[in-house]
Amino acid sequence: MYSVYVPRETEEHKLKVRCKTARAVNNIDIYVPIEAVADEDVVGRAGKILIPAGAKIIGRGYCDAEAGRMLSRGKWTFYASDHQITVDATLWDQTLKEGLEGTQFSEALDQERIKQAIFRDGAYVYVPSQTEFILELQGNITVQDLPSAFEK
């Protein structure tokens, strides 16, 4: 395992990753998994690709009922070839507003479950698949080698 600390940087030097949701996101359940894919290569200052385009990304979101948005601040995991990269990140929309704005489309979900989400969180928030967003990385970055399925 390899771990690095990314020092606090000025706004223009913060590492930002353009992403797209791989499936719809909603607050039907308390735990809100966000599955995404990196839209473009993330290149470090030395010119090396740190995270390739197409890398799978997993994070956790939560509902902000007042704003009608899905927010996420915390751990995100990137899966790139044989590495698992864990980072602290904040989710921003394309206009650099924190979180993803929800829509009214419910994807024919059980209306009782939607009512439960409204009762629990104060709102039902749905974000469609293929929604573009930005992850702003900060703090610690941990890189872990994943074992091969073909090695003993």
Residue ranges and their predicted role:
Residues 48-50, 56, 84-88, 134:
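Well-ordered beta-strand positions in beta-sheet-rich domains
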Residues 11-73, 77-79, 125-126, 140:
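Structural recognition of beta-strand segments within beta-rich domains
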Residues 66-129:
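Extended amphipathic ligand-handling, pore-lining, and cofactor/metal-binding catalytic surfaces
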Residues 1-31, 109-152:
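Intrinsically disordered, low-complexity leader/linker segments that occur at the extreme N-terminus
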Residues 15, 42, 50, 71, ...:
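Generic detector of leucine side chains in alpha-helical contexts
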